[in-house]
Regions:
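Alpha/beta-hydrolase superfamily serine-hydrolase fold, recognizing
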Residues: 3-210
């Protein structure tokens, strides 16, 4: 099994769609060099964490999606629109006991209060906020996606957009499995050795891409 890590360009030096274009180009390169690497060009998987999760989904939505048998967003940042503009986002949709609520709100606000800043840093044009290649949640054509494994963290700001995207996939009869790690926050995938959930997440991904 061959693994490749994509060193895509980063904003603000290289705003949207630079990172997306880089990821697509790598998929195309792997397909065109499949014989050299002894891989099946129609049996590729793509995964990413946070912004990388959104890029993975965007690739699945694009013309290279036909080569991707599995797309794995790990708490993907699937919507870069400002929270104040979102009718689906609400603190009350996070189930938490009252004495812990202030801690959860503090964690959620790390991204909720940054969304306008993220738009300014990531996008060339604010009108791209709902471009499906920047915010996959707003995609209307899901036909290039064949299978999705969605990893969620219970107290992640982006969880609600992930939940909504999963519903869109199910409504379109696209296979989508959601694994939500209870009690976890955005970034838990980096805590191998500290969180058992991280180890379980890695094993689940390995099981799905075999």
């Amino acid at each position: 099994m061959l693994f490749r890590s994509i060193d895509y360009r980063l904003a603000p030096e290289a705003p949207f769609p630079a990172a997306f274009d880089d990821c697509k180009d790598v998929v195309k390169w792997l397909v065109h060099h499949a014989d050299h690497w002894n891989i099946d060009p129609n049996n590729l998987s793509i995964a990413g964490e946070s912004a990388g999760g959104a890029l993975a989904v965007s690739c699945g939505l694009s013309e290279v999606g036909k080569y991707l048998k599995l797309v794995i967003p790990i708490y993907g940042a699937l919507d870069v629109c400002s929270a104040s503009d979102l009718d689906y986002w609400d603190y009350d949709l996070y189930d938490v006991i009252p004495e812990h609520k202030k801690y959860v709100i503090t964690r959620l606000n790390r991204f909720r209060n940054l969304n306008g800043t993220l738009q300014n840093l990531y996008l060339n044009d604010i009108s791209d906020a709902k471009n499906p290649m920047a915010s996959p949640l707003y995609a209307t054509d899901l036909s290039n996606l064949s299978n999705v494994l969605m990893i969620e963290a219970e107290y992640d700001y982006f969880r609600l957009s992930n939940d909504l995207f999963a519903e869109h996939l199910w409504n379109a009869d696209i296979p989508c499995e959601v694994i939500r790690y209870q009690g976890m926050d955005h970034g838990f995938y980096d805590r191998l050795g500290y969180c058992e959930q991280t180890k379980d997440c890695i094993l689940e991904i390995a099981k799905h891409i075999k």
